[in-house]
Amino acid sequence: MYDDFLEALKDNHFEEIPVDARTFVEGEDFLGQPGLSDIQYDIVEAMSQIYRKEDLIEFMGEEEGSQYYDKYTKNEIILQLGKGSGKDFTSTVACSYIVYKLLCLKDPAKYFGKPSGDAIDLINVAINAQQAKNVFFKGFKTKIEKSPWFAGKFYAKADSIEFNKSITVYSGHSERESHEGLNLLLAVLD
């Protein structure tokens, strides 16, 4: 009984325990996509590692959580892959996974030390408006719309998708400067 009391006092930030990247990508309840290559899974894991070390240890155990944190926690990722290697596809998967992981939190803004309910923004910036709309954003939007897990948790607009908990993914391009003032967690430069 005392252990239950201590467990209740713990600062649990999660509304739902997130699934691993492979389950998220391939699972019918999530994206339901074909499996990725090992390199693509590593890219997705590195791009989407947003959790604190202590939370990873709680989910995965001391050794695995620490190793995961050390391997995948990055501030910047540069993909230098050839044409047709799946950079845009992998980026849309990673962005989807980040949004999923944010929505698993009770209050994503508070988790990152921001005021409760504060905006969290993710953006893809392409060279021009057509590329912004037809490459990354189209693939991202399709994944979200087809995923049973995201049903009822978003509102799609022409150049953005607003999710519950004040999370927004924007499609931008370098021809305009309206991206100032965003609370960016992720920026994908295409």
State what each model feature region is:
Residues 1-190:
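Phosphate/NTP-binding elements of NTP-utilizing enzymes
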